[in-house]
Every structure is written in C-alpha cells, then in structure tokens.
Amino acid sequence: MTHEEILSMLGDYVDYLIANSSAEAPMWNIEKVRSGKPNKWNYIDGCMITACLSLYKTTGDEKYLRFSKNFIDWFVQEDGSIKTYDPKEYNLDNVNQGKNLFILYDIYGDEKYRKAIDTIRSQLLTQPRTKEGNFWHKDIYPWQVWLDGTYMAQPFYMEYETRYNKMQGCIDSYKQFMNIKKHMRDEKTGLYYHGYDESRQMYWADPVTGCSPNFWLRAMGWFMVAMVDVLERMDEQLYNEYRGIMAMLKQTIEDVHKFQDEETGMFWQVMDHPGVEGNYLETSGTALFAYAVLKGVRLGYLPKRMAAWAEKAFYGTCDRYLSKNPDGSLQLDGICLVAGLGGKDHRDGSLAYYFSEPVVCNDAKGVGPLGLAYTEMIARK
C-alpha cells in the first residue's frame, strides 16, 4: 500500500469502529467483550476517546466530537458523579479518561464536566503514595510504581494543577518523574523497567533495586507519551522542571530508537530481546512511540530529525498489521491484550510471561495510539 492509501484506510477504520460502538458496547474493548460484563469507566475507552477528540481537533469533523460527547455523557451525571467509577478504588488507570473532560468542558461549558473533573481529582488527593511521594499504581498493589501509571494520571494531574490550583501540584508531578528516572532507568540501555516495588517485597522485584526484570514495550510507550502530554499541559514558567522533563524525553527517545527494528520500523514486545522465540513485533507500543515522537516534534520538544523514526514506525505497523477482510471490514492485529505484574495470576515479569499474554486484533490499546499517531500524520500533511 502507498502512504496515501494507508492514511485513507485508517480514516475508514476509525469510522468503522465508532459506527459499531457505544458506551455500553465499545467493540474496541476486547477485555470487556471477553468478560461479558457491563462496561465501566476505564482507561481503554479513555484512550480511544482521546483519539476521537484529537481527530475532531485536527479534521474539524463534528462526528468525532458528537461520538465522544455521547460516549462520556453515558457515564457523567449532572451532579458530577461518574457512573461505575469509585475514587476510593485508588486505581490510576481510572484517571486517564479524565483528560477528555477538560476538552468537553472547554467546548460546551457544561458544569457537570467541571464537577466530574473534581470527582477524579478527589482520588489523587488521597491516592496512597510511596515514601518518596509517588502515587501507588493501585491500592491493591501497595508501594508499587508502574510506568503505565505516568500516562494514566500525570497529564490529568498537571492540567488540573495548572488550570485550577495555581500550579501547586506541578512540582510534585515533576518529582514523581524524577523518582522514576532514579529508580527504574537501566543505565546500560537507557530503557525503563515496567515496575518498581519500593518495599522490595514482591516476588517479581529485584531484592536490591526493587525493579521488575524486563522492559515491556507498551509500558515504555505509555511513559514516552506521558512526558509529551505533561509538557503540553505544563507552564513554561516552571523553567527548570519544564526543561528537566524535556531533556528526559529527548534522552529516552534516543535510547529507545536504538531498539527499533531496522527492517520493519517496529519494536519488540520485550524490547531488548529481538528475534527470541516467542517474542514478536508489537503494535500498541510501536504506535505509542510514533505518536510521542510526532507530537513531540510538532510541539518543539524534540528535534525534527526524529520524525523519520516515527514515520517508519507508523507505516511499518500499518504495512505489517493493518488489513482488509473479505467482507470489507478492516482489522489491526499484533496487539498485546494486557500485561501486568503480580495479582492473582502470579505475573512474574519474565520473558515467558510477556510472551504468554494473548495477542488480539482491534483492541483500543493498539487502535487508540495508532489513531493518535494518525492525527499527527494528518497534521504534518
């Protein structure tokens, strides 16, 4: 396929997904579909709605805005409560969807969105923290910091503090990134480990460093996008902190790029084990890299030379995994459904574990990031 054909196909693909989805039955949320349970407020839908709102902003096509508003209005009540969401669950994943409320509030001015923003902020006010001050990833994972959590919570936190709290929490957000760099970055590769246990008690944690054993691609992807999204919401008056995160972002992209597959432009599920039996070129993390770099270049955080790395990742993913079915429907493959640490399934962070999780098609953890990268590609045209 030519690049123009890929971009046209992706536009059709997103339209197909939203035409066949609602808040009660999002076809892109494969975990929900497989569970058979009613839908809940969750980060997976949040990622997809972020992509839809970005498409609205880039294209001006109101169908993306209408869909996003209808989707979120199913959850958000007039008093600002959010159907199925409990702040006291203390799960950072549930904060992700909150970013979209700022956009809807700016467009519509409906106070229910402002109240819902405060509902989500209430979670972060009492979210348990490590002794150094980082949010626990979830209440059920005490003393643990996961890379994923930076994307889930920090952009919302930075935007709230900048807009509504006189920037009081902005330095706190910055310090959480610096703690992650201190504890979770591998000096040899420049990559970041998926998880860190401050207590060093979990079976997956190194007894000395507290880190999990491997570099999971999607966690790195979330982390790269988190830095870009936080910078976008951060006031440049915070001179040292703003430049600190920007330098961290640039160094991370440089280090990650060394692991980009030369032939396809993609990245491996476990990043530093290319070609190992069971490992595979994975869609979601590659798309997150493409999005983070393209957006970072557009906003001036990253040098323009890096855009070529992102375009190679973007088109490489589409060439390998985007296809048309005989019935005309489109399909995006190569998406790791889920990966975590600990829990009832005894997830130990080993290579065998990361290779064992299901690989699926059309899940928003891949479609959402690719949709976001697609909006950046359109913006470059």
Predicted regions and their residues:
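Long, well-ordered core segments of solenoidal/helical folds
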Residues: L7-P26, R66-K83, K115-N134, M167-Y196, ...
